[in-house]
Structure formats: C-alpha cells, structure tokens
Amino acid sequence: MDTQTETLLQEIAEERRSHYFGKYRGIVLEALTGDDIGKLKVSVPDVLQDQPGIAVPCVPFAGPSHGLVAIPEKDDGVWIEFEAGDPSQPIWVGCWWGTGDMPSQAGPKIRTFVTTGGLALVMDDDKNELSLQHPDGPSITLSSDGIKLSTDAATVTLNTQGISLQGNTAVGE
C-alpha cells in the first residue's frame, strides 16, 4: 500500500474514532429552562461515558414565538444524535419508551398526547372523534354527532337535535 493511501486510511480511522453518527439512547438528567429553547442535560453512556451533555432540541415545527413544545422530563428516555458527529454538540431528536411505558390510549388509529399528570388529548380516527380528558374524569369530546361535556355528575350534549342535560344537576340556581 502506498503512503498516500495509508495516510488517507489513518485519517478516516481517526475521523471514525472521534465522531459519532446515528442515534444513541440517552436519559434526561434535567430539563434546562433558563434559555427557553428546550435544552436538556442528558446522560449518553455509549458516547459520553459518565459525563453529562447539554442537548439542543430538534423539533418538527419551530419559529419566533410559535412551534410544537413538548419537553421530556427527568428520567425520560431520549434519542440523541451529535451535530456533524461531534460529541460536544448533542441534539435530542425524540424519545423512547421502556417496556410498559406507552400511554394506554394509543394505537395505530388513535393519536394521543398525554402529560405526566394524566391530562390527555386523544384523536381517534376509528370513532372520528377528538377528546380532551382530565385524569379525574371530566372530558370534552367533539365528534361528527356534536360536542359532549362530561363529569362524574352530569353530561351536557350539544348536537343537531339541540342540547341535552343528564345527571344530578340544577339549572338556574
């Protein structure tokens, strides 16, 4: 092998040893809220060993004063990539669930956004409905039939037939 080829192979090998491409499993150590851009302090043992990294977000929609904001919490699993493969520039690009951690409302035709506290936005294509659900029971459901407001004590339904009120209620008190 000539010297030029050998040098090139050494450079490629060194580049490979010092750069990390692809996704790596990380764990959120802390959500950093001071700069208002969604940075996370993360642990990525396969790359950073026992040193934490500060990861910037990669989100599907963002701009001045608008965008999709869903910041993972402490101990959540996050997928980490590194800008241009540089381990000093981590990017969190998504999250992963451990076994049994996925919200129970989800499925192939059910899109769900659930907070840690149990507040849920559920979009069910099979039922053709959208609902906001509170973990203590109240909900608002929109469907092609109308709108339903529900609590443990009462249900109000607004549809093409009018308004119905069911439950232990007093109107006009």
Language-model features: locations:
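Short linear motifs in low-complexity, proline-biased tails and propeptides
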Residues: 156-165
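Glycine-rich ThDP/TPP pyrophosphate-binding loop and its adjacent helix/strand module
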Residues: 168
